[in-house]
Amino acid sequence: MAVDLMRFPKIDDQTAIQEAASQGLQSMEHLIRVLSNRPEQQHNVDCSEITDFTVSKFKTVISLLNRTGHARFRRGPVHSTSSAASQKLQSQIVKNTQPEAPIVRTTTNHPQIVPPPSSVTLDFSKPSIFGTKAKSAELEFSKENFSVSLNSSFMSSAITGDGSVSNGKIFLASAPLQPVNSSGKPPLAGHPYRKRCLEHEHSESFSGKVSGSAYGKCHCKKSRKNRMKRTVRVPAISAKIADIPPDEYSWRKYGQKPIKGSPHPRGYYKCSTFRGCPARKHVERALDDPAMLIVTYEGEHRHNQSAMQENISSSGINDLVFASA
């Protein structure tokens, strides 16, 4: 190994590596050919010499690759074969391993002419619209890539909703396909479609979807409106929390909540004059003057004073009837 390297002291390392590697590969190919031939043809060639020559060339390549700037070389054992025999063997290997001229077949690839994008017309008045040789609507499918030609306007119009119907024909304009998510769901549209029940279909104060319950109840979401608020200060009639000054309506307490920074809670009342009245009020003590009450009214009453009087009179008549009975 070291002897072969010392023979070329002035050759560049890269050139020496390439030469040694090529000679080793050629000798290895020659050895493979010899071993693959018939047994009666192997007695003329000594496989051991070819193997030694191949191994020596690969060792030379390894030594050249591992060598550094100040490497030291040791003289290896001298091979018993003479230099003339090695040169003769090398010439024989080169002669047998000359590559044959490869047959090159040139194929001319004609570029495909892509027609300009055009609109697709579908005529539903005719029995058959898609033929096997239709040129206007041709879809190109491949195993690895799925590509749709200019006739993808049908799919794009089906997705984007572009298209017009006239005299039994649909004219579809070509448009790019919208991307689809990996989960298979279409992207969220800017204007979501919402179904309303028939009762609130044209109402602006209701929004939402129709519930699928069997009872057929309306579950439309009511839009929150700003309620009318009115605040008044009235004197307290007693120190009890439940005692509030009366007014022209009847109220029923439905809850209370503590107030931060005040020892007195806030009471919540709703109108009990008529069932379903949306009017509410809450009463709390004033922080600056505990003898005053702050009453805040919310919402409007859905009844008038005449209806209240009729309700009171009817309730009085019923009491008299029950008393006489």
Swiss-Prot record:
Disrupted-gene phenotype: Reduced rhizobacterium B.cereus AR156-induced systemic resistance (ISR) to P.syringae pv. tomato DC3000 associated with reduced jasmonic acid (JA)-mediated signal pathway. Plants lacking both WRKY11 and WRKY70 are totally impaired in B.cereus AR156-mediated ISR.
PROSITE patterns documented for this protein: WRKY
UniProt GO MF annotations: calmodulin binding; DNA-binding transcription factor activity; transcription cis-regulatory region binding
Highest taxon of the lineage: Eukaryota
DNA-binding region per Swiss-Prot/TrEMBL record: 240-306
Expression across tissues: In young, mature and senescent leaves.
Keywords for this protein: DNA-binding, Jasmonic acid signaling pathway, Nucleus, Plant defense, Transcription, Transcription regulation
UniProt key word DNA-binding: yes
Pfam families in alphabetical order: Plant_zn_clust, WRKY
A cellular-component GO term for this protein: nucleus
Its biological purpose: Transcription factor. Interacts specifically with the W box (5'-(T)TGAC[CT]-3'), a frequently occurring elicitor-responsive cis-acting element. Regulates rhizobacterium B.cereus AR156-induced systemic resistance (ISR) to P.syringae pv. tomato DC3000, probably by activating the jasmonic acid (JA)- signaling pathway.
PANTHER family for this protein: WRKY TRANSCRIPTION FACTOR 21-RELATED
Name of the featured protein: Probable WRKY transcription factor 11
Annotated organism of origin: Arabidopsis thaliana (Mouse-ear cress)
Source lineage: Eukaryota, Viridiplantae, Streptophyta, Embryophyta, Tracheophyta
Gene: WRKY11
